[in-house]
Each structure stands twice: as C-alpha cells, then as structure tokens.
Amino acid sequence: MTVAYDRESISMATSATSGKTSRQRVPAAERRDALIEAAIHEFAQDGLHGTPVDRIARRVGVAQPYVFSLFGSKRELFLAAVERCFEQVAELFDRAAAEFDPAVALPDADVLQAMGTAYVEMLSTDRDRLMLQHQAYAACDDAVIRDKVRGVYARLVAHVQRLSGADQERIDDFFRYGAWLNVAAAMGVEDLSVGCEWIRAEAMDDAPPPGPSGV
C-alpha cells in the first residue's frame, strides 16, 4: 500500500522525533483563514489595486510568495475576502434569526426586522466589512470580480428570504434600505433624507451667491 504524505506533515513529524527544538508549524488551512481575515482588513482600506500583497503577508507573518502559493494571485485573494465578508453577513443574519423570540419582541417585530437591527449594529462596530463591500462593488469593472460579487449578493438575498419567509416586496425593501445604510455609514452620517440637517447645511455652503435682486 502506498501512503502519501504532505511536506508539512513530514516536517512536523521530523521535528517531533528530533532532539532539536523548532517552532510549531501552523497548518496551511489556518494560515489561509488568517490571510483572508487580514485581506478583509487591508482591502477594505485601499481596495484591490491599492493594496500590496506583501502588506497582507506581513500582517500574518508570512512571506509574500507563500500567499501566492495559496491563492495564486492578488485577485483570487480579493475574491476570497469578498466571499468571506458576505458569508459573515449571512452568519450574522443566522444568529439574529435564531435569537429572535416573538414572546419578548415588540408586537410588530419579526425575524426580518431582527436581522436588520443586527446589520445596523454591525455597521457601527465593524467598518472593515462595510468598506470591503464598497471596494467589491468598485472593482466590478473586472468581469471575474463582477461575476463573483453578483453571485455572493444573490446568495445572500436568497438566504435572507429563506430565513425570514418574507415576501418579495419586503425583501426588496430590506436590501434597498441596507444599501442606503451602507452609503450613510461609509460617510459617517445617520441620515440621508433630503431634509436632514447636514444635507441642508452642505447645500447652503454650495449655494451660489444671491444676484442683484438678492434672490
């Protein structure tokens, strides 16, 4: 019988049986997860084209060639980060749905509202997931990235519909409001309505000076 061993297993076994002390090797799967989390943070700040891979590698404590050995290219790492980001939003909705208790909720509250509340809380505490969504949409001039973003977005919509059991109109409203919240949170404001104070103030600052008649 032929038994196949990977190089990492051989290295760990050799270290365990030798008299020499060596640093414990981190499994490739753990390194991959750590690199994806680091990529979420770095790509959220500077996007696909503005983020050097070696900055992500340094954050995890590995060499840049190792990153390419796992992901192949910076674009593939970016795609993995985007997919993980949307998966984490789906997991957030899972927890909100599981924790929703109609017995203690407000009379008109339901699972969909609980998921919306959880998302609002995430936006206030996790800017990386927010900004990576914007960076993903901004990179959609690349057809491969566009296809990935469409796919993860569509899966999230279907997931929310399954969890909530809400009709199409409410699901549409949920995601429209979510997009509105994303823009507001990115700008650091709480309101985007026409009559809100900061929009009125900005409009006054940009208004042309009055003419001779004072109008």
For each feature predicted by the language model, list its residue ranges:
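Basic, helix-initiating cap at the start of DNA-binding domains
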Residues: M1-D46, G50-R59, E76
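Alpha-helical structural segments
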Residues: A34-H41, Q45, R59, S69, ...
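Key DNA-contact positions within bacterial/archaeal DNA-binding proteins
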Residues: P65
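Secondary-structure edge/capping motif, primarily at the C-terminal ends of alpha-helices
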Residues: A96, F100, Y137-C140
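Helical hydrophobic small-molecule/effector-binding pocket
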Residues: L106-H134, A139-V144
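Hydrophobic/aromatic-rich alpha-helical bundle segments in the mid-to-C-terminal region
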Residues: A143-V215
